[in-house]
Amino acid sequence: MTDSIPHIPVLVKESLSLFRDRNPVVFCDVTVGAGGHAEAFLTEFPSIERYDGSDRDLSALALSENRLLPFKDRVRLRHASFEEVDTLTSDGTYDGVLADLGVSSMQLNNLERGFSFQGEDHPLDMRMDTSRGMTASEVLNSLREEEIGEIFRNYGEEPLWRSAAAAVVHFRKKKKILTVKDLKDATSGVFPSYRLRKKIHPLTLIFQALRIYVNQEGAQLKVLLDSAFRWLRPGGRLAVISFCSLDDRPVKWAFREAEARGLGKILTKKVIMPSYEETRMNPRSRSAKLRCFEKSFEDK
């Protein structure tokens, strides 16, 4: 499979509604991906004169560039992490900032990227930015058992993290873990029968943990939440879509802390989730949560 498989953006209507009374002029999308949200925002808001879209995934940026050709005079795309976006951004630049966290359908469907446990013979890569950093395979073959266990526990919240880490280290003594199938084989005896009978694949949490570690998603999210409030103009809004509690919790806490400090107010007192219709059409949207914060109109 290739990167041409389309990604279905989630909570698009709900995201647009959070900015409809603002008519943003300068907007930042720090996870532009294949350009789904960007296309919707640029269509909905003719007021947007500059749309800065960034992503760590070069293949996604190529798709986004093609998709956003009708808006090319209003779009500026950048290959950048959240940290790199921060170094490029002056305080008080944006009317709105959007972040759509996690892995995209496009990345999951491209089995060559190693994000999905369906790609038996494909390499365990899992890097958003394939130009830098350790692959998931390198992590599993080089780190100590205790370190691998901590990854499974801290980033996957996998109950059987000790057993899974021990199984990985035992397997790699005989054969390097290079492919998805190798990881499946390494952990084949870890999960009890009731986990195997569930709809959710038993390796889901292990794959989540490896992806988060490989891409340093926790550290990147911290950079975003420490920086994005500064990027906003007075009255500007930060909207964040998350797909797991490890992402949603820090967003919720950061918004609460910012509100307590008088930096602005939380607009989503009740977190926004996909409608039944959206989850039916796009099952991968079922865990999505959208939160939004509005910066105060007065400088603090």
UniProtKB/Swiss-Prot annotation:
Among the Pfam families in the record, one is: Methyltransf_5
Top-level taxon in the UniProt lineage: Bacteria
Q: Which PANTHER family match?
A: 12S RRNA N4-METHYLCYTIDINE METHYLTRANSFERASE (PTHR11265:SF0), S-ADENOSYL-METHYLTRANSFERASE MRAW (PTHR11265)
Organism, by scientific name, is Chlamydia trachomatis serovar D (strain ATCC VR-885 / DSM 19411 / UW-3/Cx)
Q: Note whether Flavoprotein occurs among the keywords.
A: no
> Known SUPFAM superfamilies for this protein?
Putative methyltransferase TM0872, insert domain, S-adenosyl-L-methionine-dependent methyltransferases
Q: What is its EC number?
A: 2.1.1.199
This chain's function reads:
Specifically methylates the N4 position of cytidine in position 1402 (C1402) of 16S rRNA.
Specify the taxonomic lineage. Bacteria, Pseudomonadati, Chlamydiota, Chlamydiia, Chlamydiales
> GO:BP terms for this protein?
rRNA base methylation
Q: Which GO terms describe its molecular function?
A: rRNA (cytosine-N4-)-methyltransferase activity
Residues binding S-adenosyl-L-methionine, per UniProt: G35, G36, H37, D55, F82, D100, Q107
Name the enzyme's class. transferase
Keywords, sorted A to Z: Cytoplasm, Methyltransferase, rRNA processing, S-adenosyl-L-methionine, Transferase
Catalytic activity, reaction form: cytidine(1402) in 16S rRNA + S-adenosyl-L-methionine = N(4)-methylcytidine(1402) in 16S rRNA + S-adenosyl-L-homocysteine + H(+)
The protein's location, in the record's own words, is: Cytoplasm
Q: What is this protein called?
A: Ribosomal RNA small subunit methyltransferase H
Q: Which GO terms describe its cellular component?
A: cytoplasm
Q: According to its UniProt record, which protein family does this protein belong to?
A: Belongs to the methyltransferase superfamily. RsmH family.
